[in-house]
Amino acid sequence: MKLLYTICAAFMLVAMTSCDEHRDFPDTAMKTCDILCTDGKVVRYEDVKSQGKKPIAVVFHINQNNGTQGTGYAVYLWDIAPEAYSDSIGVKQNTSASITAFDGNMNTHSMYSSGLSPAATSVFDMWQYGQSAYIPSVAEIRLLYGAKNSVNDYIKKCGGDVISDKPEECWYWTSTEVKDMESAKAWLFSLASGALQETPKEQPHKIRPIITLYN
């Protein structure tokens, strides 16, 4: 009986020690300013080099809305050189023309399917790592504008093109056509001020592709 009590006491001591022991578990949840790599993995910036990965984009938004597709958005490290939204005047690209919809991916596919959008073609041509990049909608690029100051440091650390505040370098195409003027104009967005501008679609402007994450 004494031996039984001794064994029971030993088990209780082990159990209490296990419960009281503090353990730090790594926080693996995706966060703003994490890095999307060419293998599709999202890691902390500090882990890019140690894991031998190649960065391609920076996470700028984590989705909290179940009605929004994906778990977040990442912005590509580099700008695409200025291209026209459309090389033909008077043609609709059949985007939603909604400035509140998070539908840049669908808009970009509509632009590309028209066969008349140099901007969309340039984005499709950059899919060298299997990442489905697209031109952000007005609603999506507004999210990027809100996170610009945070992600710019990491874009720079990864060797990318920092999002400029210079008036002559801050304007980017969105994938959203202007409602009731779809055949002539699309929205241009300033990542310096957050301003929107109706712009003739044949004008060349820079593009900053983004990607929807499903991590």
Mark where each language-model region is.
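Short hydrophobic beta-strand that contains or immediately precedes a catalytic carboxylate
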Residues: 75, 135-136
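Positively charged n-region of N-terminal signal peptides that target proteins for export
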Residues: 1-7, 20-21
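Hydrophobic helical h-region of N-terminal Sec-dependent signal peptides
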Residues: 8-13, 78
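Processing junctions and N-termini across compartments
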Residues: 2-3, 13, 167, 203
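C-terminal motif of bacterial Sec signal peptides marking the signal peptidase cleavage site
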Residues: 14-18
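Terminal interaction module
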Residues: 26-27, 103, 107, 163-171, ...
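Short, compositionally biased
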Residues: 19-129, 201-215
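An exposed tryptophan-centered "aromatic clamp" motif
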Residues: 119-132, 138-191
